[in-house]
């Protein structure tokens, strides 16, 4: 999918770019598979902000996606390729032979009229889902389960994928987009192919208003706040007090490891992800 740029007739259009959406075949979702979810705008039950920089987005319907793909040995025809405002990847409406409809994450290269299937005996073809133990090494997969039957949790965003790197007993070695190598049980399901909308990272928002449509509010630097609001606040002129950068609650940031040590899933990590030292 290509990127559309604009003539600089305004300050906003000078840097703005959008996807051309030429591959999209449907503009309205399939209503039986949609929900209306209330938007909390980053507030908890008490009405207080629990997540900053959220609020004021455009209304949207939630599309119910089948991340489990457990309807096995029944082929389905791809009916549409649709935009989903709730995620960066595109989605596809599929119709099974028995007449049931479902939304799935659209893999890159899938087209209307293609057939997809789930199950251990499925063909190694883009869009088919099967136990990861049945997929040959070197194959790119997305929507990968970490727990059997829970549904895909890894490689679900636009252009993301994992690569089958090998086998270790009943576990499959999966190389993730972050360069981490992780063990996944051979009976966990995965979908063949790369997640759609690979050009998503090339889109430039271009103006503040477009971020507001997405529900993103402005981020104020701590150094321009008062001492009561942020550890970096106060002082004459621009100064952060000479301390290492911290969050508003005093937790070190910018390089500080915040991942909890000794997590139960650590035993499945074969190789940790490489950290970007140039930040």
Swiss-Prot record:
Pfam families: Ribosomal_L2 (PF00181), Ribosomal_L2_C (PF03947). Residues 223-279 are annotated as: Disordered. Keywords: Ribonucleoprotein, Ribosomal protein, RNA-binding, rRNA-binding. One of its GO terms (cellular component) is large ribosomal subunit. GO terms for biological process: cytoplasmic translation. Residues 270-279 have a biased composition (Basic residues). The keyword Signal does not apply. InterPro entries: NA-bd_OB-fold (IPR012340), Rib_uL2_dom2 (IPR014722), Ribosomal_uL2 (IPR002171), Ribosomal_uL2_bac/org-type (IPR005880), Ribosomal_uL2_C (IPR022669), Ribosomal_uL2_CS (IPR022671), Ribosomal_uL2_dom3 (IPR014726), Ribosomal_uL2_RNA-bd_dom (IPR022666). One of its GO terms (molecular function) is structural constituent of ribosome. It comes from the Bacteria. The keyword Transmembrane does not apply. NCBIfam families: rplB_bact (TIGR01171). Belongs to the universal ribosomal protein uL2 family. One of the primary rRNA binding proteins. Required for association of the 30S and 50S subunits to form the 70S ribosome, for tRNA binding and peptide bond formation. It has been suggested to have peptidyltransferase activity; this is somewhat controversial. Makes several contacts with the 16S rRNA in the 70S ribosome. Part of the 50S ribosomal subunit. Forms a bridge to the 30S subunit in the 70S ribosome. This is Large ribosomal subunit protein uL2.
